[in-house]
Swiss-Prot record:
Cross-link (Tryptophyl-tyrosyl-methioninium (Trp-Tyr) (with M-246)): W97-Y220
Pfam families recorded: peroxidase
The family this protein is said to belong to: Belongs to the peroxidase family. Peroxidase/catalase subfamily.
Annotated source species: Synechococcus sp. (strain RCC307)
The reaction(s) this protein catalyses: H2O2 + AH2 = A + 2 H2O; 2 H2O2 = O2 + 2 H2O
Protein name: Catalase-peroxidase
Amino acid sequence: MSMAEMRCPFSGHGAATTPASATTNQHWWPEQINLGLLHQHNPAANPLGSNFDYRQAFNSLDLNAVKADLMALMTDSQSWWPADWGHYGGLFIRMAWHSAGTYRLADGRGGAGHGNQRFAPLNSWPDNTNLDKARRLLWPIKAKYGSNLSWADLIILAGNCALESMGLPTAGFAGGREDIWEPEDDIYWGSETSWLSDERHDNDGAIESPLAATEMGLIYVNPEGPHGEPDPVASGREVRDTFARMGMNNEETVALVAGGHTFGKAHGAAPSAHLGADPEGAALEQLGLGWQNTYASGCGADTITSGIEGAWKPNPTRWDQGYFEMLFGYEWELHQSPAGAWQWHPKDVKAEHMIPDAHVPGRSAPPMMTTADLSLRFDPVYEPIARRFLGDPQAFGNAFAQAWFKLTHRDLGPRSCYLGADVPEAVMSWQDPLPTTSHPTIDAPAVDALKQELLNTGLSHGELISTAWASAASFRQSDRRGGANGARLRLQPQCNWELNNPEQLKRVLSVLEAVQMRFNQQHQGGMQVSLADLIVLSGSAAVEQAMAATGQRCRVRFTPGRVDASAEQTDNASFNALKPIADGFRNYLRSDLPLKAEQLLVDRAQQLHLSAPEMTALIGGFRVLGLNWDGSDIGVFTSRPGQFSNDFFVNLLDMSTQWSPVEGHSNLYQGIDTETKQPRWRASRVDLVFGSHAQLRAIAEVYGQAGGSARLAADFSAAWSKVMELDRFDLL
């Protein structure tokens, strides 16, 4: 055997057929949907095992001991990465901020909830330069507490401790963030193919949804100004848009920018040409550390990060009003840093405002501001807020503490997901709060009695099932928002979403509310039923009866205990971000979307934590039950709509039907009988993808073959119950 034949097949060298160098299917067929998005984070990839309970592990921690270790680390400067002014606080605040700051409101993705800063692409984003060192500084603490403390929680807790160590009382801390063990492939970070490039703005300057940052590889905006142009007013417009896309209002934005820049410094000792590859591209022997710096010592006073150089205020390791005092106390002139980045220096700086160098005794420098910082002074909306904070230190401190808590906890989910002794008692509207109840929930006999009453209301199976789905399927796993608990389907804005068929919804809910009122009046002082439970129970009962009509006997799991939220507990603007632009399960698609319907179906299924078989089973069941949002016959491949069967798959796979697109409709197809040439069915792209896509067709064949009907009923029932309980964090 030759040496070439003996080469390792995973090395990327040698034969053209080695796996590491092979051209992928996605290269050949880039338009094909990626079902891998539905099967991320396989339990087999988790070294802790499927039985590991992080909630239990975290609750066993001595949280005060962890915080004491973090406090000690703040001033334990290491020679391999020395702390600025002997304090790592600024570095850890940036690390925590950049972990949480990837969150965007539009789809709930990003954020601090999974420790994804450890993996590509975030670990190698230009805006995260040198945060690999921050995580390595934390490693001894992570190693000490092991699996009882996730990286995701440790990163945020380190930021909290950094703030407290420098004099800011925080609003609290909640644990509960479970680590992932591989990159998240479902997050769309943009279409750009080079760092710090911008192809996400349209001709009117709007950022492509769901993105929030202005350039590829940035957390927020370019600190030098839009596209590197040092224009504070234009920067203010970008800052406002970006922070709003991350769920922050104007006051929260000013507080966060000013509060974050109260500490630490920016680093731009020399041009970025001195930096080596990022962590993902670094040499093997660097063990995951990137941005090796060839300038002078490569660290300390010679550090290169953003290219901007300097601190914002005197005393960069203490919480005070210095940021605003500098911002409004001077006129500012444009300069370039040693790295060539645009930044601003004060005119005629006073001697007492010169800032001692972070590492070199006897050397000092004036304060600096970025273009984005100056937007707080020159933007007409931000300026009065900033001046108010300048004159009211307590208001500034409180606003920053609350905004920081929101920033770092936004994607953790409802308060029932919060762990630890430092969880604040205060309830915030952005947490989508739910009321507490003291009455007992309905028991099994009551459930059975209510089922019969609900089925006898005169409402159709389709009306009951579609209402339950509309309630539960608002859930998104990205930030654990939405879902059936709270019955917010009856409140603004959800009750008026086009997808939810408002007129039908109003009629169905009025009937269910009457059932609820009768039951609760009959059981005063005892068990009570919430509308949230009734919505789910009615849909589940209708599913069971539709299955029974075709001989399928399935018991749909139902667990009571949901509560009803009030309008006062519901932030309309925030909840409107959950409004679906497409729902393939109900054959709903807005006409102005650039993505194909089948791509949006996979995205929706991923947010509902569904596998490809679960998604397939639900689609097949929904079609024969006639659950299209508008009542159309599109995809209803059955002669007995409303009865549960595997007809959708049987007829989809029938070779005697020939399909062709309907002229003038991008999402509509006509199926004709190949013999008679008569129309048979109409279908959407979502319907036909289950016969077109090889993997989905393979699953569809299982449901369309002999024995498929019983399997479909069981799988549909399980998937339905799963979706109905996605937001039941109280059951954890």
